[in-house]
Amino acid sequence: MIKNYFFNDKFYKDLIRKKKDPRIINEYKKILKYKKMIKFVYQNKPMGTGDAVLKTKKFIKDKYFLMLLPDDLIINKNCSKSMINVHKKFNSSVMASMRVDRATVSRWGIYKLSKKITKTDYLINDVIEKPSVKKAPSNKAVIGRYILPKTIFKKLKSQTAGKGGEIHITDAIQ
């Protein structure tokens, strides 16, 4: 479905022809600009985010990479840009977070925070995947934006399945 959104040239050409809307033309031009940079990988069966990330290894060339999970909708134009700026400043991994109600922590990966380093940034000691309310170290939840080092692939490759029989990216981050 996502692949069709980006690569369905016939759809966009028909839409442009029918609507003649400059916004649609501009959107299509943006997609064309990035089309060669976008790669898709598929999991034959759902084995967790760690397994999905492992399948991208051959495409990762830089020391760090930005990972966006499509099931977390973040309505903020600058989330990835802000994360990249933090990464450049501290030369480290960066993970987005959001505050969640303590009663719902068992639905999320939860950060164990070490130290507040700026108004919005923390050092992270650990990530606990879907802890009980009693065992949750904070109410800062993992959301689908990460800047991770290429070395994560080595950890993922040797990792055994965690909760639900899946390979979790959060387990490899620890």
Task: Indicate where each model-derived feature is located.
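Conserved beta-loop-beta/alpha segment of the NTase-like Rossmann-fold superfamily
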Residues: 2, 12-15, 24-113, 157-159
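A glycine-rich beta-to-alpha transition motif near the start of alpha/beta enzyme domains, typified by
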Residues: 9
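Catalytic-core segments of class I nucleotidyltransferases/pyrophosphorylases
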Residues: 66, 80, 84, 116-174
